[in-house]
Amino acid sequence: DALGDAYEYLIGQFAAGSGKKAGEFYTPQQISDILSTIVTLDSQEPRTGVKQRLDSVMDFACGSGSLLLNVRKRMGPHGIGKIYGQEKNITTYNLARMNMLLHGVKDTEFEIFHGDTLANDWDMLRELNPAKKPAFDAIVANPPFSYRWEPGEAMADDVRFKSHGLAPKSAADFAFLLHGFHFLKDEGVMAIILPHGVLFRGGAEERIRKKLLLDGHIDTVIGLPSNLFYSTGIPVCILVLKK
């Protein structure tokens, strides 16, 4: 694993020197530790400690894969059935695949897809048969903050969004959240890093937030200070969701 650790170290050093571009592929280690700790605890009874096993872990904006590897580190090399990731940037996608292999993850133990999460262009996730719909025990994500997107009219009927509504074009934060939440198992845990604005912005975001709260899906909100990320100085939060 020393080779993998060295690779992660170099990615971190590169992120530190590349400023705003770093946000596209790197989650600082300390924040990664918090997320991986949360999703590996027993979701119904966190005090009992770490789950014995996770059948599947997903990061739909996986960057270099560091978050997924952190979850694996906590569960042990045989504690996860399969690791899934998705990444839009082809260079970063290749970084993630290399990162997995250098950490000793066999190519049969992970699947990383190069594609657009919001467009949901991964065939595996487009399964229409409810009995075969993929779902994950743990979902972690650090998606791009306040990403501008262009949802078409058909997107309002998308199974991921239709019960909550569409996030505004100016900020896809809740679109990313709802994408992940849709694929979370009933007993699973999702932890996502988002800008603080998702907690108080109005309009469509307020409606989505209110429904999530009223339905009891927001388990925990963890506020974090500003200047934790290389890519932005804004304060962020971790939202923990359960079904």
Q: Where are the predicted features?
A:
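Short, solvent-exposed loop/turn segments at the edges of secondary structure
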Residues: 78-79, 232-234
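Long recognition/docking surfaces used for binding and targeting
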Residues: 1-19
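Conserved beta strand-loop-helix elements of the APE1-like EEP
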Residues: 236-243
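Short, solvent-exposed loop/turn elements at beta->coil junctions and helix N-caps
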Residues: 224-229
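Conserved S-adenosyl-L-methionine
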Residues: 24-141, 146-148, 153-155, 160-162, ...
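Short glycine-dipeptide loop
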Residues: 184-189
